[in-house]
Structure formats: C-alpha cells, structure tokens
Amino acid sequence: MSKSENLYSAARELIPGGVNSPVRAFTGVGGTPLFIEKADGAYLYDVDGKAYIDYVGSWGPMVLGHNHPAIRNAVIEAAERGLSFGAPTEMEVKMAQLVTELVPTMDMVRMVNSGTEATMSAIRLARGFTGRDKIIKFEGCYHGHADCLLVKAGSGALTLGQPNSPGVPADFAKHTLTCTYNDLASVRAAFEQYPQEIACIIVEPVAGNMNCVPPLPEFLPGLRALCDEFGALLIIDEVMTGFRVALAGAQDYYDVVPDLTCLGKIIGGGMPVGAFGGRRDVMDALAPIGPVYQAGTLSGNPIAMAAGFACLNEVAQPGVHETLDELTTRLAEGLLEAAEEAGIPLVVNHVGGMFGIFFTDAESVTCYQDVMACDVERFKRFFHMMLDEGVYLAPSAFEAGFMSVAHSMEDINNTIDAARRVFAKL
C-alpha cells in the first residue's frame, strides 16, 4: 500500500469519511485521496514523493501559488507577536482599508473566519435590514453549509424549498426559494409570488460549484433591476471570484453593483478568513451599532489578517490578472484543441483565473441542467488518467479549476500535452 492509502485507512477510523471536508475524499471520482506533504509554487507534493501540477489551489485561495514568500514572511512576523488577542488590532484597520479600497461597493466590512460565516451573516443582515424572511438562491450554486442554504428546489419553481441534507428543518428550508441560474424569468416569478416577503437574492456571479458557469450578459444586471423593483437586497457571493476574476471581483468584471458582498479564500491568502460588507446604511444595522447580531472569537485574528493583507497587496500589483487570464485562456484553448484532435466532445468555460471542463455534446453549458447532462463517468476516467500524468485537477465534475500566477507557460503546455495523451486513450 502507498503511504496515502495507509493514512486514508487510519483517517477513516478517526475522522468521518477520513477527511475534514467531503470533496477531499475523492467520492466524486473514486479511489484514494492524495495526502499532501508540502506545496510550492504551482506544485503539490504528496506523501509518496510524487509531484503534481496543481489546478485546485486549495480550492481557490492560492492565486499567487503555494508558499509565497511575502505571505509566509508576514505570517511568521505576526506569529512572533502573538497568535490571538480577542481585541482590536491595527492590522484589522489596515485590512479593512485595503479591502474597501479594492472593492469600491464595500463602504464597510466585517471580518469573519470562513465563506460560510460570511454568507450566513450577510443573509441574516439582509433579513434584519428589510424585515423580510425569504431569500432567493440558485440551483447548482453553493454558498456554504448554513441551514438556510442547504436547500433544493421543490417540485416546481414556485414551491417552497426542501432540505437537501438531513438535519435541516423544513421550517428553515421553506424560506429559501431556489431559482434557475441564468434564467431571469424564474426569478421574476418568485418575486411576483412573494412580492413583500423576499429579503435578498444571493448569487455566485460566476457559478463555481457546478464546475464553472459564467453568467449570461443580461443575468446579473437583471437581478439588480429585480431587487430594485421589489425592494430586496442583492448579495453577490465573491468567496470564489473575489480578487480572482478581476481585482475588484466579478462585480467589476460584469459591471453590477451589489448591496452586500461576501468574500473568502484569496482574502486570507491561505488562512481561514471570510468577510462581508457593502452599503453603509445596511452595515450600520450590524451589532454593536445595530440590532442584527454577529460575532466571532477568532474573527480578525492577527495571523490571518497579516496573511490576507500580504496576499491582497501582491494580488493588486500590475499584470497579475492579465497573467491569470493569459494562462487560463491558453489552457482552455489547448484542451479544446487536444480534445478535438481525439474526437472527444468537450466544452471548457473560463473567466479570469477560473475554468471548467465539461464532457458534453452540447455547444455550451450555461445552467445546472446543462451541467447535469454532462458525462460524469468520462470525467472520472479523465481525472485519474491526468493524475497519473502528474496533473491534479478538482476531484469532481462539479468543481471549478483554479489558475495561479505561479504557473508557467511550460506548466500549461505540459498539461495540454498530458491531456492529449489521455484523450487518445479515453
């Protein structure tokens, strides 16, 4: 047995499923998950000594690559001053100043410890600010594991939501309406059914949890207009897209103004950080100056703030996003060319430093239904064959891939060459 196999066997006796987040267990592709010893730049190194070109990037945070010296040094320096104080620090102020400068729609920001905390807190704030209970989310979008978000659509577009996990009470789920991503008609129908009850829409501006599905041109502006028409707030979940699709996020890339924004992943530089913020009048409803409660023992802790501050300063440097786009575009085009040579039907969506690989005969993939029609079994084989070639892709047909500026054009070309060999056998 490999060392990864031995560790996985031991882990399953101690940790549910052997992992601390389900997708890591390789249940979407089968087989034994890699146990990682270290990472540097664009590469992961497993406990058995094999190196992989990494397109998971810790599920998004590693936009600069692994073990970036500026972030590493910032963490070391902060740790020498203490790990956590439970009191305000200067770095929290500097971090808030930087975030609100980089994302102009955020007048104020509150730091938390994860993307899930950010989204659930933003929704609570929207409900408290509007005095309404219902929310709209979209099929195939993921906003963390808060109870109100682990909800699937009922039997029709206007039926009440149903829990999609045991442990979520039906009384919670009934306040969540699930509409179709990229379908404004379904959203309007929900508002017309409940015109005075919907507090907010929460949306991934690029859906990254049904692989990578960008918005149609009219979708995000249409959501903004519907929120304005019916007095609801628009929450854009930029946990995945923030500082990646563009420096000011997908909201800047697609020119839409939210009321609240949720951030995570890159904002922590690899440390556990989330944030939410937006309009000053809305944020003023948050405790301790307003009635909507939110708190966290480790929120804004000095180590995480130091890592995030260093990361964002590097991400804000000229050329970063142009490099991400160039590398991702080359990868997408190369994969399509290699698939076409082998007669493999393939769609590759990409925007900024995100991409998605779909085995499908369709000309495009724009919604959850399109994603579910793709050939998952072929993806599983592709994943394992690419892994054997030393390329680590997301171990699920429903997760986006992530580029970093640490990837070289040689890494990209080697990945395309590996895919060409795999497609020939697929």
From Swiss-Prot:
Keywords: Cytoplasm, Isomerase, Porphyrin biosynthesis, Pyridoxal phosphate. The modification N6-(pyridoxal phosphate)lysine is found at K265. GO terms for molecular function: glutamate-1-semialdehyde 2,1-aminomutase activity; pyridoxal phosphate binding; transaminase activity. One of its GO terms (cellular component) is cytoplasm. It is found in: Cytoplasm. Pathway: Porphyrin-containing compound metabolism; protoporphyrin-IX biosynthesis; 5-aminolevulinate from L-glutamyl-tRNA(Glu): step 2/2. The keyword Ligase does not apply. Belongs to the class-III pyridoxal-phosphate-dependent aminotransferase family. HemL subfamily. PANTHER family: GLUTAMATE-1-SEMIALDEHYDE 2,1-AMINOMUTASE, GLUTAMATE-1-SEMIALDEHYDE 2,1-AMINOMUTASE 1, CHLOROPLASTIC-RELATED. Homodimer. This is Glutamate-1-semialdehyde 2,1-aminomutase. It comes from Escherichia fergusonii (strain ATCC 35469 / DSM 13698 / CCUG 18766 / IAM 14443 / JCM 21226 / LMG 7866 / NBRC 102419 / NCTC 12128 / CDC 0568-73). The lineage of its organism: Bacteria, Pseudomonadati, Pseudomonadota, Gammaproteobacteria, Enterobacterales. The gene is hemL.
